[in-house]
Amino acid sequence: MMKYFITAMMCMFFGSAYVLAGDAEETQMLETKKCVACDLNNAWFESAALRKADFSGANLYRANLEYADLRGANFTGANLSNARLRGANLTGAIFDGATLKYTNFGEANLSNASFVDAKMRGARFHNTNTDGIRS
């Protein structure tokens, strides 16, 4: 637990996004913006710059992606159940076939995003920009 606290504090000091769990797949995502079918359960990508990232097939259960730049990101077939995407920029993101049960999209920008065949039971969209969404 102390390792995670120190990592979080260092990254807050330097003003960058940080990952609390600190495993190899999360580091890979931050470095390459590609982590197909990765297990990112409980990952912490708050305020991360992940434009056009490929999360296809990834497990992002309970992940924190609040205020992240995810424009054009690919979440095809990903599990984002109980994930937090509040305030995230998801313009043009692809959620086709994704599981989004109880996902929080509050205050996010979802303009021109695609949700074809997405499972969205209980998802929250309070004050969310949904202009041009495809489903």
Which ranges hold each PLM region?
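Positively charged n-region of N-terminal signal peptides that target proteins for export
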Residues: 1-5
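Cleavable N-terminal signal peptides
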Residues: 7-8, 19
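Tandem repeat scaffolds
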Residues: 21-135
